[in-house]
From Swiss-Prot:
Function: Plays a role in nuclear translocation of the viral pre-integration complex (PIC), thus is required for the virus to infect non-dividing cells. Targets specific host proteins for degradation by the 26S proteasome. Acts by associating with the cellular CUL4A-DDB1 E3 ligase complex through direct interaction with host VPRPB/DCAF-1. This change in the E3 ligase substrate specificity results in the degradation of host SAMHD1. In turn, SAMHD1 depletion allows viral replication in host myeloid cells by preventing SAMHD1-mediated hydrolysis of intracellular dNTPs necessary for reverse transcription.
Name the record gives this protein: Protein Vpx
Cellular compartments annotated: Virion; Host nucleus
Gene3D superfamilies attached to this UniProt entry: 1.20.5.4730
Gene Ontology BP, a term: viral life cycle
Gene behind this protein: vpx
Amino acid sequence: MDPRERVPPGNSDEETIGEAFDWLERTITELNRVAVNHLPRELIFQVWQRCWAYWREEQGMSSSYTKYRYLLLMQKAMFVHYTKGCRCLQEGHGPGGWRSGPPPPPPPGLA
């Protein structure tokens, strides 16, 4: 066996992959918790639906890849929001964005 192909002790391929999927789930959950205080829930839900429709249904990618693409888009949205001068906590638009009424359901399995 080539030493470059050896897996370090305590890190089998399955554990490494499982850890990556766990990290992805934790990161998306935390991002959603923060995002609902800064972005409208409708926007978050629409981004999730669009990612799922395009990456999962149209392109046939895995659900993990779809979640990864959702994570990238939401990180960009939060970055733009912060760079434009976030005043959410000062103005207090509250959780769920600016629209009144009951919020739509959160992205499936993510919040």
